[in-house]
Amino acid sequence: MHTVTQTSLYGKDLLTLKDLSEEDINALLAEAGELKQNKIQPIFHGKTLAMIFEKSSTRTRVSFEAGMAQLGGSALFLSQKDLQLGRGETVADTAKVLSGYVDAIMIRTFEHEKVEELAKEADIPVINGLTDKYHPCQALADLLTIKEIKGKLKGVKVAYIGDGNNVAHSLMIGCAKMGCDISIASPKGYEVLDEAAEAAKTYALQSGSSVTLTDDPIEAVKDADVIYSDVFTSMGQEAEEQERLAVFAPYQVNAALVSHAKPDYTFLHCLPAHREEEVTAEIIDGPNSAVFQQAENRLHVQKALLKAILYKGESSKNC
């Protein structure tokens, strides 16, 4: 008999971290820690995850595919050329067809509204593997990494430096829910979305944490326990690259900036990283960096999530 983390997630979707309670997140992080120690748990015999990718990926594809295999199931990779979505089939029809073939859908796409529609029309759970607005699986891995290194989440100060993007939105909401104080420094015109900021501030009031938004990276990293960076130009923004590099230059995480953080700060980055753009090689390859521990943790939190969504708690013999 395999143990099952108690969450409210069985059979449900994960579109943003707003879908999870503090108790759910704590349970998922505990389960992820267990799965990190005992990687192979063949509980998913006969279960299949459909993985829809409209944006390319290394970590998302490999971690979900390996995770399903380690849990005894299988994963189907579906690119745009494998589906009829790009040739006029509706999201609703795709959702209904896949619901008859597989047990869950993970989708990595551009428009968040597409994930919402897929979840509405599907009869099976849908997991957001990334949209332009949110990246909840990454934030779960971030929280696990912070907890592993700092030993706690409540009271930890996290500073995010750079574009107010999907990663920033999910990190901000996750930190606010779990009691981390988060400061986000972004240039004017590149701030986080109001809807994400307002949600995070509401959660922070409940958890006793704080959310600070600024355009000053030094202010953001002052006495920080964790410094987090992401690329200045995300997929789909290539036409803006030169403009962005100029605007974001003062937001590079380098030795001068991290000197304002705590001496034992931890550097995180969701990867892929562009060394000497958003972060210097000295920092990302230095002793305070935990980016590869963070990347590995994508596997473990996603396995915990899949187990919570798809596994009732039968013995592996009957699963």
UniProtKB/Swiss-Prot annotation:
Listed GO cellular component terms?
A: cytoplasm
Q: What is its EC number?
A: 2.1.3.3
Q: Does the keyword Transferase apply?
A: yes
Compartments where found:
Cytoplasm
Which GO molecular function annotations are given, in alphabetical order? amino acid binding; ornithine carbamoyltransferase activity
Q: Does the keyword Transferase apply?
A: yes
Principal cellular location given in the protein's record: cytoplasm
In terms of domain of life, where is this protein from?
Answer: Bacteria
Ordered alphabetically, the record's keywords are:
Amino-acid biosynthesis, Arginine biosynthesis, Cytoplasm, Transferase
What positions does the entry give for L-ornithine binding? 166, 230, 234-235
SUPFAM superfamilies in alphabetical order: Aspartate/ornithine carbamoyltransferase (SSF53671)
Protein role: Reversibly catalyzes the transfer of the carbamoyl group from carbamoyl phosphate (CP) to the N(epsilon) atom of ornithine (ORN) to produce L-citrulline.
- Database matches in HAMAP family: OTCase (MF_01109)
Similarity comment: Belongs to the aspartate/ornithine carbamoyltransferase superfamily. OTCase family.
Name recorded for this polypeptide:
Ornithine carbamoyltransferase
Q: Which organism is it from?
A: Bacillus subtilis (strain 168)
Taxonomic path:
Bacteria, Bacillati, Bacillota, Bacilli, Bacillales
Q: Which gene encodes it?
A: argF
